[in-house]
From Swiss-Prot:
Gene Ontology biological process terms in this record: DNA replication; negative regulation of DNA-templated transcription; plastid chromosome packaging; sulfate assimilation; sulfide oxidation
InterPro entries referenced in this protein's UniProt entry, alphabetically: NiRdtase/SiRdtase_haem-b_fer, Nit/Sulf_reduc_fer-like_dom_sf, NO2/SO3_Rdtase_4Fe4S_dom, NO2/SO3_Rdtase_4Fe4S_prot, NO2/SO3_Rdtase_4Fe4S_sf, NO2/SO3_Rdtase_FeS/sirohaem_BS, SiR_ferredoxin-dep
Protein name from the UniProt record: Sulfite reductase [ferredoxin], chloroplastic
Xref: PROSITE patterns: NIR_SIR
Swiss-Prot/TrEMBL cofactor(s): siroheme; [4Fe-4S] cluster
UniProt keyword list: 4Fe-4S, Chloroplast, DNA replication, DNA-binding, Heme, Iron, Iron-sulfur, Metal-binding, Oxidoreductase, Phosphoprotein, Plastid, Thioether bond, Transit peptide
Modification note: Phosphorylated; this phosphorylation reduces DNA-binding.
Subunit annotation: Monomer. Interacts with ferredoxin.
Binding-site residues, [4Fe-4S] cluster: C497, C503, C543, C547
Lineage, opening ranks: Eukaryota, Viridiplantae, Streptophyta, Embryophyta, Tracheophyta
Cofactor remark from the record: Binds 1 siroheme per subunit. Binds 1 [4Fe-4S] cluster per subunit.
A Pfam family of this chain: NIR_SIR
Main location class: plastid
Disulfide bonds: none
Length: 573
């Protein structure tokens, strides 16, 4: 069985403190569609991987004068991601400068404006949290819920990387919102920007050794690659010291420079002044559990256990990534491929070596080609492995055999394995608002529950006592929050990015358009006689950057222009 991939061919200033987002009234029906040009085949087995790719990445000239993108200059002149952001946030202007717009990404925020309004731009900021494994404390959830009402647009957005997004925050409120998150067990540091982003792991709170080990490893990797120079706290809480603790193995791995990985005299020992060439994404999981879309990450880490279920080490994949540019076939989505196996005690050193290889060799002249996947595509996996091993100080061991991957959503009621239960609630496109927002707060607050965000934009209520199951089920049902068996299977697995009206990269609808699109797909299924239970995974993005991972969907719709999409078929999430 093979899986085929291929392309089908300014408003008035705000008077109120909240950004008003208009409703969407549907896409115009269109019979026009681009036709496939090149079919790109991918075996479904993880043991014989091919790549999603079109052509080779253009090599950077070694003889020409080294050029750098504008963002590289901004980073160099920023005093470790401080200037001019630290000055811009103090002005009365509703927006920040071009340089500060790039720097604030490292702090976990994007400057946006409502693209459906004409005239002068109504600027606001999207704030994204960083939650390794999707873990969210009770205190942080209630804080985010409050902030959405007080400073946002009244909704919370769950992302495909297990984080919150808070839209519509005005510049004058940024410091208040950021400081509130920091002081309530949260962080936005590194949720965006040219560094390691949120580290994914299965969200299910299963009391199994492999799951617990995967989640702890994800948290350790996140700590290892967190910025160290203090710029985040200097700007948002005036340098206030936030007490945190790190496992000693994380500190040791970060400080180790026995193979030339570090900048020894820098406040950023791993990143230096320039950080990474581009964003960097990592996921950790256990065999069979592909809730994290493991092969779409720059680094994919898989726990390997012995026959008794004891973790022994990790298989590592490298070079995945979804983003591309329309009609530029030197850009492409790509699946990660195996680089090798490492013992469990070496995982932090191996990950650090891969990150440093990208830091030193990734392109910094053209950001379209700056992701790790293009370096590996240009070099080939053998050369890449050889260079990584120099920083790692060891040879990778042969990749261990793995079973086939399965898509896991963890919706509904499940036993954790420690005497407690968890409940996975489906959230259409990750948007928590209205009655759902009110009811979730009521349940989470009443029972003092922690939650987890899944990579499929859903939410899990954790550590539920058996006696609470019935009243929680009743409360959710009375609010119209349906159990999975009552939700259309198309909706259960569908995902869409926010797109219009706030995303600056969107070229058509995604989140606001997907309800109507799914209804039309269901109508087609009914006409051809497909059973209700027979479904496909549908993912929609408003641009080719692939935030909802559409290239891995069985049916992927990728925005190609106003009210038009490329159609990508045959993925296996």
């Amino acid at each position: 069985m093979t899986t085929s991939f291929g392309p089908a061919t300014t408003s008035a200033p705000l008077k109120d403190h909240k950004v008003q987002i208009p409703s969407f009234h549907g896409l115009r029906s269109s019979s026009a569609s681009a036709l496939p040009r090149n079919a790109l085949s991918l075996p479904s087995s993880t043991r014989s991987l091919s790549l999603i790719r079109a052509v080779s990445t253009p090599a950077q000239s070694e003889t020409a004068t080294v050029k750098r993108s504008k963002v590289e200059i901004f980073k160099e002149q920023s005093n470790f991601i401080r200037y001019p952001l630290n000055e811009d946030i103090l002005t009365d202007a509703p927006n920040i400068s071009e340089a500060a717009t790039q720097l604030i990404k490292f702090h976990g925020s994007y400057q946006q404006y409502n693209r459906e309004e004409r005239g002068s731009r109504s600027y606001s900021f999207m704030i994204r949290t960083k939650n390794p494994c999707g873990k969210v404390s009770n205190q942080l959830y209630l804080t985010m819920d409050d902030l959405a009402d007080q400073f946002g647009i009244g909704t919370l957005r769950l992302t495909t990387r297990q984080t919150f997004q808070l839209h519509g925050v005005l510049k004058k409120d940024l410091k208040t919102v950021m400081g509130t998150i920091i002081r309530n067990m949260g962080s936005t540091l590194g949720a965006c920007g040219d560094l390691n982003r949120n580290v994914l792991a299965p969200a299910a709170p299963l009391a199994r050794k492999d799951y617990l080990f995967a989640q702890q490893t994800a948290e350790n990797i996140a700590a290892l690659l967190a910025p160290q120079s203090g710029f985040y706290y200097d700007i948002w809480v005036d340098g206030e010291k936030i007490l945190t603790s790190e496992p000693p193995e994380v500190v040791q791995a970060r400080n180790d420079n026995s193979h030339g990985t570090n900048f020894p005299d820098s406040p950023e020992p791993i990143y230096g002044t320039q950080f990474l060439p581009r964003k960097f994404k990592i996921a950790v999981t256990v065999p069979t559990d592909n809730s994290v879309d493991i092969l779409t990450n720059d680094i994919g880490v898989v726990v390997v256990t012995d026959d008794d279920g004891e973790p022994q080490g990790f298989n590592i994949y490298v070079g995945g990534g979804m983003g591309r540019t329309h009609r530029l076939e030197t850009t492409f989505p790509r699946l990660a491929e195996p680089i090798g196996y490492v013992p469990k005690e070496d995982i932090l050193y191996a990950v650090k070596a891969i990150v440093v290889t990208q830091r030193e060799n990734g392109r910094r002249d053209d950001r379209k080609y700056s992701r790790l996947k293009y370096l590996i595509s240009s070099w080939g996996i053998e050369k890449f492995r050889s260079v990584v091993e120099q920083y790692y100080g060891k040879k990778f061991e042969p990749f261990r055999a793995l079973p086939e991957w399965e898509f896991k959503s963890y919706l509904g009621w499940h036993e954790q394995g420690d005497g407690k239960l968890f409940y996975g609630l489906h959230v259409d496109n990750g948007r928590i608002g209205g009655n759902m927002k009110k009811t979730l707060r009521e349940v989470i607050e009443k029972y003092n529950l922690n939650v987890r965000i899944t990579p499929n934009q859903n939410i899990i209520l954790t550590d539920v006592r058996a006696a609470w199951k019935r009243p929680i089920t009743t409360t959710l049902a009375q609010a119209g929050l349906l159990q999975p068996r009552f939700v259309d299977p198309l909706n259960i697995t569908a995902m869409a990015c926010p797109a219009f009206p706030l995303c600056p990269l969107a070229i058509t609808e995604a989140e606001r358009g997907i309800p109507n699109i799914l209804k039309r797909i269901r109508d087609v299924f009914d006409k051809v006689g497909l059973k209700y239970s027979e479904s496909v995974v549908v993912r929609i993005t408003g641009c080719p950057n692939g935030c909802a991972r559409p290239y891995m969907a069985e049916l992927g719709l990728v925005g190609d222009g106003p009210n038009s999409y490329q159609i990508w078929l045959g993925g296996t999430p």
